[in-house]
């Protein structure tokens, strides 16, 4: 437990940010899983709407620095490839 006032504040801030980051990352993962579930069930329309939601969540994670932009691009590319494979 920190004794210095600024260190106490930083600990509190770090805990708040950790929880906030975890919720954003969790929402991103959930959106990705929804796309993959739709693809597995051969639901093309549902997969396309889920893909736009997943892309939005992934981009928000990039904007806040949770995920590297290249990693996000890879996620989105793989999901798009799966969704496009349904309609083909």
From Swiss-Prot:
InterPro entries: Ribosomal_bS20, Ribosomal_bS20_sf. Keywords: Ribonucleoprotein, Ribosomal protein, RNA-binding, rRNA-binding. Gene3D superfamilies: Ribosomal protein S20 (1.20.58.110). The keyword Ribonucleoprotein applies. GO terms for biological process: translation. It comes from the Bacteria. Pfam families: Ribosomal_S20p (PF01649). GO terms for cellular component: cytosol; small ribosomal subunit. GO terms for molecular function: small ribosomal subunit rRNA binding; structural constituent of ribosome. The keyword RNA-binding applies. Binds directly to 16S ribosomal RNA. Part of the 30S ribosomal subunit. Belongs to the bacterial ribosomal protein bS20 family. NCBIfam families: S20. This is Small ribosomal subunit protein bS20. It comes from Bacillus subtilis (strain 168).
